[in-house]
């Protein structure tokens, strides 16, 4: 199988080495390794160079962090352009739903416009480079992101760990956008309902590691092999056998990322 979304650069080095070396025996053939910013992209690039074919890097700027100074953003965009041939996608990019929600909860002012402009620039780069995008866009933010994707004529969009209302789900399905499920599909009703609704041909499996999970994964280090659990849970919702579910999710990921 393929873990369609993981932050390898956030694992401690010794753990990372053992994790990556264990993948063949865990029946994991590849990982889509996303990045947070330029420093993160450089680390992801280094990991991918040590594990060619196994680690497929994506470079970008994660929205749930302070906005970069213009010179830093320009450096990132130039660097991504320079290394476009080496990357599977631009990501992780999107809008800061959780940061905004926290600020509002604490009565703090929040201006979304700079984040929307940043995403617009990153999507423009993806369009120019003809690369797919890995998106952090949930709930009402996903509708805005759909608007931007259409403005840039981007069709290869992967909404990772997606959550959102029915009208947005319908819009995403109509545009052929992909989503991916994490191990929380085993214990979150909201996610299970979405999994039943979203077309099987537009779905992938991910871990978002090293993000920790609850339920049967409480206290465990997040490992790419958990995508097997995701496949089993997702397949059960659709009446697939375990092997059928794994084959479908893997084929979808290969097709989307052109692996």
List where the protein language model places each region.
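Mid-domain alpha/beta scaffold segments of enzyme catalytic cores
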Residues: 1-259
